[in-house]
């Protein structure tokens, strides 16, 4: 750490001068890697461990971090503090070794809270839309010359990274409710996009517990802070009287403080008007498809307006918005001549959405922007518990596509649950009579099973949160060609 970096670091958090070496267990995760990247750029010595290399670990290695692709006690012994992902179990050898050596072990959100402590924190929470909204706020602040620090759960395409250290007092961060760790954060502004039943194991299956946790999160705001909340969401509308802070509401609803009107979509762009209290209307062109993204933009504009950012900067940022990785991520348009001998093309889009609400939003955006396309979805359910708990909702939304290929459930460490598997879900969807799903038991066969169902005017949605993103990239690299055709 050089003198200049250390001086800057001490000016932000003087007490953290005692910390030299920060070790991350599960460093390859987007949220963990983002915080590690900011701290590396602040001059800390960073190390971490994960099971396999990925784009996040490559980026950190380039910044000088030491990455171990194993979990061993000796990896942590020189650390001042160990940061642990919620995906890591308490019996991990590095965690055990840290406890034995009396090295503090903290969760990711606790370290994020330290980054936020002496900055103007803007935290983005909610069941859906966090990553994109965080990126939109960051883009607007950057366009306005405010040079924010941001820590996002997905790749911010314009920056080519999940996180970036800025030189201003602003820190914009995604706030994760999945393990309730967002309660560590004490932001100045908090966005809540929506609240639905997800990650219910954290909340002991009690939706009231989840709702109260969001209230507690908002009450971490100082009394002069501000909550920015989507009034279209019925749960948020119900909770508004319980929020003892200043509130700005947004949405399509007539009574929203920042109201979306006249929405229309052409291809990948949304066009709409934002009506604000005591401010001129904004006529927005948003470079992201779907009504859900208009809501995300309304949240970002609400925050930017409150900060006093000029309208021109807001409009420029939204029109040039490059999106985030795996959120309606356009991977290319490929001719089918070498795929199945047909004329025409197929567009390939990769999307992380894995909850029925998210999948529905993606399908609606695809239908609105490309109504003439044959909509083909390759879906990988994520977790047996989610598939069980939202089974009917999944069956309904997946019945909306023209062609459905379904991979086996990505377990994310869970044991199989009878009746909550992909074969059962396919059977249920088939019985509804709208679409005849194709079960793909071997991921290596996706391209071969996809080729015959493509018509020559297709939009392929690769959908899910497991390892299906890797399959999307492989399809793009092979230009959709099955392996036996790929070299022909």
UniProtKB/Swiss-Prot annotation:
Q: Which InterPro entries match?
A: Mur-like_cat_sf, Mur_ligase_C, Mur_ligase_C_dom_sf, Mur_ligase_cen, Mur_ligase_N, MurCDEF_pg_biosynth, UDP-N-AcMur_Ala_ligase_MurC
Q: Hey, which family's this protein in?
A: Belongs to the MurCDEF family.
Molecular function via GO: ATP binding; UDP-N-acetylmuramate-L-alanine ligase activity
* First-listed, main subcellular location of the protein, grouped into a coarse class: cytoplasm
Q: What is its EC number?
A: 6.3.2.8
The listed locations are: Cytoplasm
Task: Recite the lineage of the species.
Answer: Bacteria, Pseudomonadati, Pseudomonadota, Gammaproteobacteria, Enterobacterales
Pathway info:
Cell wall biogenesis; peptidoglycan biosynthesis
Q: Which SUPFAM superfamilies match?
A: MurCD N-terminal domain, MurD-like peptide ligases, catalytic domain, MurD-like peptide ligases, peptide-binding domain
**Pfam families linked to this entry:** Mur_ligase, Mur_ligase_C, Mur_ligase_M
Q: Biological process (GO) annotations?
A: cell division; cell wall organization; peptidoglycan biosynthetic process; regulation of cell shape
Q: What class of enzyme is it?
A: ligase
Q: Which domain of life is it from?
A: Bacteria
- Please give the name of this protein: UDP-N-acetylmuramate--L-alanine ligase
Reactions catalysed, semicolon-separated, are: UDP-N-acetyl-alpha-D-muramate + L-alanine + ATP = UDP-N-acetyl-alpha-D-muramoyl-L-alanine + ADP + phosphate + H(+)
Instruction: List the GO terms this entry assigns under cellular component, sorted alphabetically.
Output: cytoplasm
Native source organism of the sequence = Cronobacter sakazakii (strain ATCC BAA-894) (Enterobacter sakazakii)
UniProt binding sites for ATP: 126-132
Summarizing the function annotation, the protein's role is: Cell wall formation.
UniProtKB keywords: ATP-binding, Cell cycle, Cell division, Cell shape, Cell wall biogenesis/degradation, Cytoplasm, Ligase, Nucleotide-binding, Peptidoglycan synthesis
What gene is behind this protein? murC
């Amino acid at each position: 750490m050089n003198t200049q970096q250390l001086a800057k670091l001490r000016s932000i958090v003087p007490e953290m001068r005692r910390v030299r070496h920060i070790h991350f267990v599960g460093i390859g995760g987007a949220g963990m890697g983002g915080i590690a990247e900011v701290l590396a750029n602040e001059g800390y010595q960073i190390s971490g461990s994960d099971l396999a290399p990925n784009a996040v670990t490559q980026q950190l290695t380039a910044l000088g971090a030491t990455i171990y692709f194993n979990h061993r006690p000796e990896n942590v012994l020189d650390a001042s503090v160990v940061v642990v992902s919620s995906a890591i179990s308490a019996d991990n050898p590095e965690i055990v070794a840290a406890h034995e050596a009396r090295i503090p072990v903290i969760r990711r959100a606790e370290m994020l809270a330290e980054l936020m402590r002496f900055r103007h924190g803007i935290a983005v929470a909610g069941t859906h839309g966090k990553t994109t909204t965080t990126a939109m706020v960051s883009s607007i602040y950057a366009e306005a010359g405010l040079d924010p620090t941001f820590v996002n759960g997905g790749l911010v395409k314009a920056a080519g990274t999940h996180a970036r250290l800025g030189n201003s007092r602003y820190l914009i961060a995604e706030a994760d409710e999945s393990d309730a760790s967002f309660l560590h954060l004490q932001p100045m502004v908090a966005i809540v996009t929506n609240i639905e039943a997800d990650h219910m194991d954290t909340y002991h299956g009690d939706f009231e517990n989840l709702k109260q946790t969001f209230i507690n999160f908002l009450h971490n705001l100082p009394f002069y802070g501000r909550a920015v909340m989507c009034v279209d969401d019925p749960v948020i509308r119900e909770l508004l009287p319980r929020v003892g802070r200043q509130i700005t509401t947004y949405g399509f609803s007539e009574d929203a403080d920042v109201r979306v009107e006249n929405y229309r979509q052409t291809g990948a762009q949304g066009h709409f008007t934002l009506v604000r209290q005591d401010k001129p209307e904004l006529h927005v062109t948003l470079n992201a498809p779907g009504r859900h993204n208009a809501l995300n933009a309304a949240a970002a504009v609400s925050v930017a307006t409150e900060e006093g950012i000029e309208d021109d900067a807001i409009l420029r940022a939204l029109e040039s918005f490059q999106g985030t990785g795996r959120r309606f991520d356009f991977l290319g348009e490929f001719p089918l001549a070498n795929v199945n001998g047909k004329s025409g093309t197929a567009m390939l889009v990769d999307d992380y959405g894995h909850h029925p609400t998210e999948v529905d939003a993606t399908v609606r955006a695809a239908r609105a922007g490309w109504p003439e396309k044959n909509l083909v979805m390759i879906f990988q359910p994520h977790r047996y518990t989610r598939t069980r708990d939202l089974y009917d909702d999944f069956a309904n939304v997946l019945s909306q596509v023209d062609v459905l290929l379904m991979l086996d459930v990505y377990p994310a460490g869970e044991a199989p649950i009878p009746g909550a598997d992909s074969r059962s879900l396919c059977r249920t969807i088939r019985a509804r009579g709208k679409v005849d799903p194709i079960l793909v038991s071997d991921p290596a066969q996706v391209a071969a099973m996809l080729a015959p169902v493509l018509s020559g005017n297709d939009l392929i949605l690769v959908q899910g949160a497991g390892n299906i993103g890797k399959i999307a990239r492989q399809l793009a690299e092979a230009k959709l060609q099955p392996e036996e055709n790929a070299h022909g």
